[in-house]
């Protein structure tokens, strides 16, 4: 009996997908809403020792008691208010101005449900380090950065190779900046509770700050000792605030520039440590540094080559962003600094840089610089554009495609015959529930997390394609709503079916067999066949006839697929980010190649 139990444990262990640290989306295929496919390993070449940093804002907590205001909505009602600071349409009470609504809502940076989403999305993108914006005074947003560190460490324990962290302090060696660096050193770095997250450069934790603020102090041995301790702990790269002049000292790093960007921190071999890539810039040709609502501001649709695009759809294509990436490829630095991920908010001033009723850093969809997906508008286009360019910059070790010869599976609940089948990993621990306050009166509740998908397998023979899926715990009843759906793209085209998926399994609640349905176009499905399936504990296996998928039994084929459980909104691909579990996340798919 003991030997039998040991054998069963070994068999189960062989089939259980291990949770190893990896950026599992780095090499998966995806196609964005514009039909742009992510490049493959063959297209981008071998992996290189390059790094990607992303500007990240942790200040979405301290002022979150304020109500949300979206200025473009007010201006749509009263266009004359655009340049009138005192127009009565503008609220006199305290509000916070958002240029649009994030996909995850008007969240606070302490919302661990959102932080976990960020961890997975940025790991899948191949981002190496997040730079926290602490450029204003001595603010470090402790509550937020500690929530992020805790969540990222939890994600790492679940197998997510999250980005590491660094801070960018003020653009000059101010007393407030010294206060900030002492605070984060004592609270975060010296205790080293989250040392695994510290991004190092030249062997030390990196900080974008000016070391001069930590100079020795004549006559004050105690402060001198503190300054030396902190000064010796970090590698310093001071931030250059100006967009058009490049580095003004050998150790300068940039954060945002207009095209053509400069290389920063020249190296002995003639290369550069760093260069910037921005989504847009609060700059105009006639005024230089400008508010984002100044006419002529360099928005998302602007390029130095062609000026301001008049195409209404250009804002969705990231023209400015792509031009900046092309320049970064020319510079070929060690690290690209991207601005940015999730700023979202901006102040409003009577006059700033000659602009009345000025919104300095953001304004509307066109005049904003966030990559994080938004509700409506350009959706997640900029996220996948970033992923594509990170792949081109860093290269790829290999394409995550599984190739296999014929391998017959018996659908009998005995999973031993899956040993040796093509295996795919999925991140565990991402079905946590959400119950968090947002900005103002917003409160977000999401209890859709249910079956936590942790792995998948595929096999085929002349008659069937076999799918296996594994969850972290026992799979719930097939009678549950939106239960364990399998999406299949049989032609690898995004223009056919629904969002490229030609077939869906389990859209209709299964009975003795599962129902396979086909889409000719959009979220309109018709029955294509039945599929035998078996669930046992945390595992399920399915056999789908090749004829039902219109896949010739003699020809090799490639398919993309994904598993999704408990989606809440049919026909909305953005629900893959928001509800239940999707493996892999968002628009990413697994790729299977039959020999």
Role assignments for model-derived ranges:
Residues 221, 408-438, 492-496:
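Acidic, glycine-anchored loop motifs typical of Ca2+
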Residues 401-412, 419, 487-514, 547-595:
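Acidic/polar low-complexity flexible segments
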Residues 478-485:
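Short coil-to-beta strand junction motifs in C2/discoidin
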Residues 22-410, 414-415, 422, 500, ...:
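Glycan-processing catalytic domains of CAZymes
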Residues 413, 464-473, 539-546:
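Short, well-ordered beta-strand segments enriched in hydrophobic/aromatic residues
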Residues 54, 122, 343, 467, ...:
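Residue-level detector of buried hydrophobic side-chain packing
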Residues 1-22:
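Bacterial Sec-dependent N-terminal signal peptides
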Residues 454-457, 528-533:
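Beta-strand-rich interaction surfaces with strong enrichment in secreted/lumenal proteins
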């Amino acid at each position: 009996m003991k030997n039998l139990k040991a054998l069963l444990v070994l068999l189960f262990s062989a089939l259980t997908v291990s949770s190893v640290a990896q950026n599992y989306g780095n090499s998966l295929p995806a196609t964005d809403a514009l039909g742009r496919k992510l490049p493959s390993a063959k297209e981008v070449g071998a992996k290189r020792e390059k790094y990607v940093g992303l500007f990240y804002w942790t200040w979405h907590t301290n002022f979150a008691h304020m109500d949300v205001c979206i200025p473009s909505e007010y201006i749509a009602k009263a266009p004359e208010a655009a340049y009138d600071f005192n127009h009565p349409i503008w609220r006199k009470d305290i509000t916070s101005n958002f240029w649009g609504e994030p996909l995850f809502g008007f969240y606070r940076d302490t919302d661990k449900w959102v932080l976990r989403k960020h961890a997975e999305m940025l790991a899948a993108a191949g981002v190496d380090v997040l730079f926290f914006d602490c450029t204003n005074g001595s603010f470090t947003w402790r509550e937020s950065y500690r929530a992020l560190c805790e969540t990222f460490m939890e994600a790492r324990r679940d197998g997510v190779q999250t980005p590491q962290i660094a801070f960018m302090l003020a653009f000059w060696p101010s007393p407030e900046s010294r206060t900030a660096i002492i605070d984060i050193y004592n609270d975060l770095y010296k205790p080293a509770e989250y040392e695994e997250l510290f991004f190092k450069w030249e062997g030390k934790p990196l900080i974008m700050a000016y070391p001069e603020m930590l100079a020795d102090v004549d006559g004050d041995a105690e402060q001198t000792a503190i300054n030396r301790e902190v000064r010796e702990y970090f590698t310093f790269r001071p931030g250059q605030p100006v967009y058009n002049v490049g580095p003004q000292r050998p150790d300068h790093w940039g954060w945002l520039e207009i095209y053509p960007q400069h290389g920063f921190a020249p190296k002995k071999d003639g290369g550069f440590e760093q260069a910037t890539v921005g989504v847009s810039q609060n700059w105009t040709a006639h005024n230089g540094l400008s508010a984002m609502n100044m006419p002529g501001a360099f928005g998302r649709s602007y390029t130095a080559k062609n000026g301001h695009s008049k195409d209404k759809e250009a804002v969705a294509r990231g023209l400015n962003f792509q031009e900046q990436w092309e320049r970064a490829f020319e510079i070929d630095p060690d690290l690209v600094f991207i601005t940015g991920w999730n700023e979202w908010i901006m102040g409003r001033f009577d006059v700033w840089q000659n602009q009345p009723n000025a919104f300095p850093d953001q304004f509307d969809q066109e005049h904003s610089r966030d990559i994080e997906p938004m509700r409506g508008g350009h959706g997640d286009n900029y996220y996948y554009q970033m992923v594509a360019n990170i792949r081109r910059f860093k290269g790829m070790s290999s394409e995550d495609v599984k190739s296999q010869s014929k391998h017959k599976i018996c659908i009998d609940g005995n999973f031993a015959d899956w040993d040796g089948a093509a295996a795919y990993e999925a991140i565990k621990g991402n079905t946590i529930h959400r119950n968090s306050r947002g900005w103002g009166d917003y409160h977000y509740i999401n209890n859709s997390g249910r079956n936590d998908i942790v792995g998948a397998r595929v096999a085929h023979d002349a008659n069937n394609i076999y799918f296996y899926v594994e969850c972290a715990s026992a799979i719930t009843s097939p009678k549950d709503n939106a239960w364990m759906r399998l999406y299949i793209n049989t032609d690898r085209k995004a223009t056919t079916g629904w969002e490229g998926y030609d077939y869906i399994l389990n859209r209709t609640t299964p009975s003795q067999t599962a129902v396979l349905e086909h889409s000719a176009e959009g979220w309109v499905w018709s029955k294509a066949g039945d599929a035998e399936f078996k669930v046992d504990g945390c595992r399920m296996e399915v056999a789908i006839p090749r004829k039902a998928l219109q896949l010739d039994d003699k020809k090799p084929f490639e398919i993309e697929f994904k598993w999704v459980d408990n989606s809440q909104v049919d026909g909305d691909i953005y629900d893959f980010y928001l509800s239940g579990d999707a493996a892999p996340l968002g628009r990413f798919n697994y790729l299977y190649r039959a020999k």
